[in-house]
Amino acid sequence: KTVSEKLGIKPGMVISAVVLRDADFLTDLRGQARSFSDSKPLKHSDLIFVGAEKAADLARAGKAAPSLHSAGALWIVYPKGKREIKEQQVLEAGKQAGLVDVKVVSFSATHTALKFVWPKAKR
């Protein structure tokens, strides 16, 4: 499977990316999405990708979550093995946004992505 397949990207989706610094990935998203934004999250996004390089960046997840479709997923993409940001902090940011974690994917050689969705009661 490609990274895009592991992340659940399908043609025709509404996709948003918030401060994600991966030009090739953003180009791929633009090519597959029905609607795409890399500035602010689109309402009813099927997928939202939030980039976080340090713990303070995790607040972006809470700001982006209200734009997520009820059956959508929010991915937090963060550096692997860095002191600036730990997995537990990423998990807590998703929880504070009202989401539950369901999956982890190796996004690239340097970054990991954690997937969050709305709890079943909110879908």
Task: Give the positions of each predicted feature.
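N-terminal, charge-rich interaction modules
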Residues: 1-30
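Short, hydrophobic beta-strand segments that form beta-sheet elements in well-ordered domains
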Residues: 14-20, 35-37, 50
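Conserved beta-strand segments of the P-loop GTPase G domain that flank and frequently precede/overlap
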Residues: 18, 48-53, 77-79
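Short acidic, S/G/P-rich loop/turn micro-motifs used as interaction or catalytic elements
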Residues: 23, 53-57
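Short acidic low-complexity segments
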Residues: 34-45
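Mid-chain, well-packed structural core segment of small domains
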Residues: 56-89
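Short, compact, well-ordered microdomains
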Residues: 79-97, 102-106
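Class I S-adenosyl-L-methionine
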Residues: 99-123
